[in-house]
A protein has these predicted regions:
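Alpha-helix capping/helix-boundary segments
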Residues: 33, 69-70
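Single conserved hydrophobic/aromatic residue that forms the stacking wall/gate
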Residues: 1-12
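Divalent metal-coordination and catalytic microenvironments
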Residues: 13, 27-30, 67, 83, ...
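Active-site-proximal segments of metal-dependent phosphoesterases and phosphodiesterases across multiple
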Residues: 20-62, 76, 81, 92-95
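Short amphipathic alpha-helices and their capping/turn segments at secondary-structure boundaries
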Residues: 13-20
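Binuclear metal-dependent phosphoesterase catalytic core
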Residues: 72, 76-139
Length: 139
């Protein structure tokens, strides 16, 4: 089973995550919590303060977002969460590694997730259909 919550208020997120019994807990949002971006740092700091603490408390496996139009996989020291930024199929922006970056690419594309009880794979795929990188988690 996979729990996917989108755009929910903080109180509702806490309630949903506290009752989650799924094998994998994946949260999808629009804005990144950790990512390289030329956009305002305050945007990410707010997400780290308001959202990341909730995700960590409830043992979320992966946080997936978009907003900045490039591929990024980040593992922040002290967190077991995989933070993933998904590219856009038609527009991509430059990207540079930050602390915790496992992979980043400015290629336009999309991601595909495959999940079973023991393994989660998120494949980052470019516009030609080539797998650029795979985020793998095992239970």
């Amino acid at each position: 089973d996979c729990l996917l919550s989108r755009g929910l208020g903080d109180v509702y997120k806490r309630q949903v995550l506290a009752s989650a019994k799924e094998d994998w807990i994946i949260v999808a949002g629009h804005h990144p919590i950790y990512a390289y971006t030329p956009k305002e740092e305050s945007e990410r700091l707010d997400m780290q303060k308001r959202v990341d603490s909730i995700l960590r408390k409830h043992n979320v496996d992966m946080y997936i977002c978009g907003h900045i139009h490039n591929f990024q996989h980040i593992r922040v020291p002290g967190s077991d969460i995989d933070y993933v930024v998904n590219s856009a199929a038609s527009l991509a922006r430059k990207v540079e590694p930050i602390e915790g970056t496992k992979f980043c690419s400015p290629e336009p594309g999309f991601s595909v997730c495959s999940i079973d009880k023991k393994e989660l794979n998120l494949r980052m795929i470019d516009k030609k259909g080539n797998v650029l990188y795979t985020v793998t988690r095992k239970k």
